């Protein structure tokens, strides 16, 4: 029987040593599903709320015992005897139990853990892989990995303003080969940094975090690594950036401060021009969060200027929220949506956000968080929903590699996997 018997929850640690929630759902038939919930460092102000204990005597106030208790005392009694095959009902029940617009009562970390664990239990009950269960009969394609090879901003302790510098191996014939391209570039990048006397320590997402002088220097070094690995920039491999502009935006002056540009301040218009210069000089295919999450006028200008040349991804801008995404679609803001499960808090709402973006011809990127675990749900989700792109870090740290290895297994198991490469960016004039 696919009905929920028990829901177990546990306070465990994420990749940054901070507490997070693990949830296991067990059905009357014995089918099981277990999920660990990720956590972000730079978060959008409209995200669903992680419930933390704020007890300074435990984990510097970051404990999640309240969320764990909510699973046991509030959620489990209400979900017992519901079918794990009815994901929509489960998620609707979770949302109603919480009763707040941002899931702050029970905690998005508790709610998401239960939602995803139920989906895994359903897949186990049916004898399916998670991606097969979510996808149904939909065609399945492997995603282009957006590999974060240099970390800056809130993800590293260096002087680089932008949070992530990524490589996109669009010229590879398969995901397996794309991963190889990326790994080889990553290792060549490490060699270059050593030759320059720079440290090869890594940031939260596994990319190197060298103390470079500017954002342009980061792009230049990555280009050198691509070439040293034997690949052609702008053909085999493109570049991407997660600017995370909200992190260096001053809301009082409405200016952007770039420390690596001699502490120069930029207006929205000037920052858009700065990006335009970068994409004219470097083979940049994607820019994420290029402006502050509340700078909608700036986003409008950015989209008008660069929206047909480069993928403009909204993360903090949209926070996987259908209301925010619809507002962006109506105002013709950005052309791509980043999807983070814990920004919204249930699988059903996540799938609705993906479908909304696709119907508006926005591209979709499935993403990890900077605080990750060994959980591989996002790998299955990227394939199941044919998003075509995934952000899950660099080629180091097991919490990142776990997702890549899961994608390799999925590709091997699929009868006729497709890897579209550059065709994924269907809304650009490339």
Curated annotation (Swiss-Prot):
CDD domains: enolase
Pfam family for this entry, one: Enolase_N
EC number: 4.2.1.11
Cell compartment(s), UniProt: Cytoplasm; Secreted; Cell surface
EC primary class: lyase
List of residues binding (2R)-2-phosphoglycerate: 163, 340, 369-370, 391
Binding-site positions, Mg(2+): 242, 288, 315
Family: Belongs to the enolase family.
Protein function: Catalyzes the reversible conversion of 2-phosphoglycerate (2-PG) into phosphoenolpyruvate (PEP). It is essential for the degradation of carbohydrates via glycolysis.
Name of protein: Enolase
